[in-house]
A protein has these predicted regions:
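Catalytic core of carbohydrate-active enzymes
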Residues: 1-173
C-alpha cells in the first residue's frame, strides 16, 4: 500500500497518472509506442494483465533487469515474452534501481505505512542512486529511504519514522559486505 499511495500523491502533485501507458515511462523505446495490453503502475511496476481464457499472455519488458514481484524470477528487458498464467497469477515486474515500500498490514488500507515497512531493494546498478518515500495518511513524507551503489558497495540510509523497518535485497548481486 505505501508504494501505491505514494504514486497517488505524486499524481496529485504532477498530474502524471498512477496507472500509465508504457510510452510515458519509456519514451525513447520505440517498442513501447503502441503497447496497449500492459501498463506501468507508478514508475517502477509493470503489469501485463491476462486477457485470454487459456491464460496466454505476451508482453514486452523494456531494457534493464526486471524481477517478478511475487516469484522473484529475473528477466532481462529489451525483449518480448510469451507465457501462460493461471487465475491466481499474472506478469507483475519491478524494474531495476527500485526501492519498493511494502506495508505490513494486509487487513486494511488505513494504517501507519512507515511502521514496520519493508523496503525491497531491486538490483541497484553500480554508479546509481535511487530513493523511495513512504507517506503518512495525509500524503506527507513520513520516511525517505535512499540507496547508493558505488564500487559495488551498496549504502542504504533512511530519514524519518523508521520503526521496525527492514530491508529485503531482491536480485542484488556482486555487493561487497
Amino acid at each position: 500500500m505505501p508504494y501505491i499511495y505514494q504514486m497517488a500523491v505524486n499524481s496529485h502533485h504532477t498530474g502524471i497518472p498512477t496507472m500509465r501507458s508504457m510510452v510515458m515511462e519509456f519514451e525513447n523505446d520505440p517498442a513501447t509506442k503502441y503497447l496497449d495490453m500492459q501498463y506501468m503502475l507508478g514508475d517502477s511496476i509493470l503489469v501485463a494483465p491476462v486477457f485470454s481464457k487459456d491464460g496466454d499472455v505476451e508482453y514486452y519488458l523494456p531494457e534493464g533487469t526486471w524481477t517478478h514481484l511475487l516469484s522473484g524470477e529475473v528477466k532481462q528487458g529489451g525483449r518480448w515474452y510469451k507465457e501462460n498464467y493461471d487465475f491466481m497469477s499474472l506478469p507483475v515486474y519491478v524494474r531495476d534501481n527500485t526501492l519498493l515500500a511494502i506495508g505490513n498490514n494486509e487487513e486494511t488500507a488505513d494504517y501507519d505505512f512507515a511502521d514496520g515497512v519493508e523496503i525491497r531493494v531491486y538490483e541497484v546498478n553500480n554508479g546509481c542512486k535511487t530513493s523511495c518515500t513512504v507517506p503518512d495518511q495525509k500524503g506527507h513524507t513520513a520516511l525517505t529511504v535512499e540507496a547508493v551503489r558505488e564500487n559495488n558497495k551498496l549504502t542504504l540510509t533512511s530519514n524519518g519514522k523508521n520503526q521496525n523497518m527492514r530491508y529485503v535485497l531482491e536480485n542484488v548481486s556482486n555487493v561487497a559486505t
